A protein has these predicted regions:
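Short S/T/G/P-rich N-terminal loop/turn motif that feeds into the first structured element of a domain
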Residues: 1-50, 59-68, 78-105
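A common structural junction motif
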Residues: 72-76
């Protein structure tokens, strides 16, 4: 499994309520992506940074979801290019289930 951390500056005069509304608007599309196991939206008002933490089945799935179209959309909406980092997640804890989930490769 792959953990992906995406961060971007929040410009364009957006307030917290604007950012949350934009996040909520994107939820249905993320729910449709069967390669996405988990997503947490991020917001840091002090540093004007937003983003997300994603858990994916594979690096290919992560890169596919956050290609040029996604990056251009972030630039247009939030006023900055996203920074994207990938991490292997060999063990994942799920406190809402009975077992830890281990990566298969």
């Amino acid at each position: 499994m792959i953990t992906e951390i995406v961060t971007f500056g929040i410009g364009n005069g957006l307030q917290r309520s604007d950012v949350v509304a934009l996040y909520e608007k994107s939820v249905p599309a993320w729910k449709e992506n069967r390669n996405l196991l988990h997503k947490s939206f991020l917001y840091d008002p002090e540093h004007e940074v937003g983003g997300g933490i994603y858990l994916w089945n594979s690096i290919d799935a992560a890169k596919s979801a956050h290609g040029p179209a996604f990056q251009n959309r972030i630039q247009e909406v939030f006023g900055s290019q996203p920074e994207i980092r990938y991490f292997e997640s060999p063990v994942v804890i799920n406190n809402h289930g009975d077992a830890n989930v281990e990566a298969t490769s």
